[in-house]
């Protein structure tokens, strides 16, 4: 019970932090978009695409590797193994981080000239390169804190990092954005660099303090595993993840380069292409993915829990956890999807004053259950040691995505990109879920997990819409934004009520959740 309650409190902490950071991030994105315009947002997204590949190279699967091996050492109560694992993991992070830094720094002119086709991106790329070793080290140490179940330390640094990033962004944009697009991009890059360097240094300091408090340094005559043996175990985890990440990130970067080019072939101007790309990728998608922060925290914490159960061959416990994850993820995601579809126009026009953004939110919202469930499934597969399979699925996903973008966008414009997102998300989720069900022998309950929540959210949003049409004057005193909040909250309450009445939420589930708090 102590482990169960510890998992709950850590999950609640990470959920709160994730929701806070995602809320602040979306709010900041709204402000930034209003300051620099859709074209600059599009160029920034292209830079982020290249930076994303560089970060992937710097990380090379180290967070998962550190989490899994430290969790394995804790499960076996093997302190010398943990000590050697951490030495190898930090070395891994620094080597790959420095290599990625040099590649991006010296390759920036070629990337800016021939890939992004915009030399205004060069300073931003070089600033981003300097931060890569710090990002890699921070990822490694975050994996350590997840494994030892002290995520509140890394969570606190994440909050401070985001506050620093946004504060610097707003400060620098006020002074630099008026000098043109290049200066605005430079302000964004400098802000991120300051925050990333702070995060890496702060996490390393916390790690040193945590090691001193909780893990004694092995004596000089203690028998330690060799660097070679631990390094091989670490690479056996990180390399499959890294190779998949390289391929997927490289293909995604290529995909993001092809999208504006495809829109130009469809008939858009260069500026309009960047603006349309920015509207979908940096405005609509963040809103759709925002509620996923609530589940993302749980998914990350599942890896060490499932890893320890897998090492101990506790198959019944694994199936029990997986059943709970599937049930609660779909209950939450279907509700979010239905409410977002029902109020997409209000969300788009309120956040961005853009009907185009509202339309893209409506089109992408039906994918929310697939996206969120795929994320949770991926975490459970990694906990079961199935990272090689995940690698194959991710490469297939990214390859089909690039091919679809190349073929569809010149003919269908932005709708071609929407179709691409649907095809790849459905394929990735299907392959991952089928694999997890096969290896865990878990039996899905379609009626309870899917049909009942779907019926509940349709009833809840329809009734809310009907009441709003019948008595719109009752919401006039709270204003337009306040009315949207009231409508969404009312829909959530009705969804919860219908879910209980129709059996999507059962007494056994309520007792299970209550047991975390009551200690029974």
PLM region descriptions:
Residues 1-24, 80, 84, 221-248, ...:
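N-terminal membrane topogenesis motif
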Residues 6-67, 94, 101, 105, ...:
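Signature of the first transmembrane helix
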Residues 32-53, 181, 185-186, 229-237, ...:
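Interfacial/gating helices of multi-pass transporter permease domains
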Residues 60-75, 288-313, 319-322:
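Helix-loop junctions and terminal segments of transmembrane helices
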Residues 109-128, 340-371:
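Interfacial segments at transmembrane-helix termini and the short loops linking adjacent helices
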Residues 135-157, 366-396, 407:
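Membrane-interface junctions at transmembrane-helix termini in multi-pass inner-membrane proteins
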Residues 157-171, 179-212, 396-400, 414-435, ...:
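Hydrophobic alpha-helical transmembrane segments
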Residues 466-520:
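Membrane-proximal transmembrane or re-entrant/amphipathic helices at the cytosolic face
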